[in-house]
C-alpha cells in the first residue's frame, strides 16, 4: 500500500527507447504491461513528424511501477532470448528504470533471499547492472530504479548484516492498535461518502 501510494505521487514524465542495440543484439524494452504510454500512438505519428517535440525513437511514459512476488526467480532478472524473433526481452529491473521496482513478500521467492540479495549488490552500489547474452557477451545498463523489498519476515532471516547495511532506508510498518484502526476505518468511510455506525 505504501509503495503504491508513493508511486501515485505526481512526478515528471520519462522517456524510454522502444529498443536497445548492444553488440549487435536487440533488446526489447518497451512493455505495454508496465509502461503507460503518454505520447501519441506510434501508428499515428511518424518518427520524423514535425508535430513531435522529442525524438520519435523514444516513448513518453509515466514512471513505471513493477511488482514481483513469490514467483520471482533469478532468470527473470536477466535477458530472455526469443529464438523466433531473435530478440531479447528486457528483465524487470531494466523495465523499471526511472521508476519503482517492488519485490513483494521478500524471502518467499523460489530462490533463497541470499541469492536474490547477492544479485543486487553491484547494481545498488554502482548504479549499473550487467546482463548476459546467450552468446556469452555482457551488456552494461543503467540501474536507476528505486528498489523496494517488502517482507513480513525479520531482517536477520533475510540476509547478513553486511548486506542489510547497503539498504539505505528501512521502515517497520506495524499493525495498528484497535483505536487507530477504528480511526483509519472512519476516515476512509467518510472519504467514500459512507456513514459509520458508532457501535
Regions found by a protein language model. Give the residues of each.
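Conserved ASCE/P-loop NTPase catalytic core
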Residues: 1-148
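Switch/connector loops and helix/strand junctions flanking conserved nucleotide-binding motifs
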Residues: 4, 14-15, 110-111, 155-160, ...
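Short, contiguous acidic/charged loop-to-helix segments that flank catalytic cores in large enzymes
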Residues: 108-111, 137-138, 170-176, 192
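A short helix-turn-beta junction within AAA+ P-loop NTPase domains corresponding to the substrate/partner-engaging
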Residues: 119, 159-175
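Conserved C-terminal "switch" segment of AAA+ ATPases
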Residues: 156, 173-199
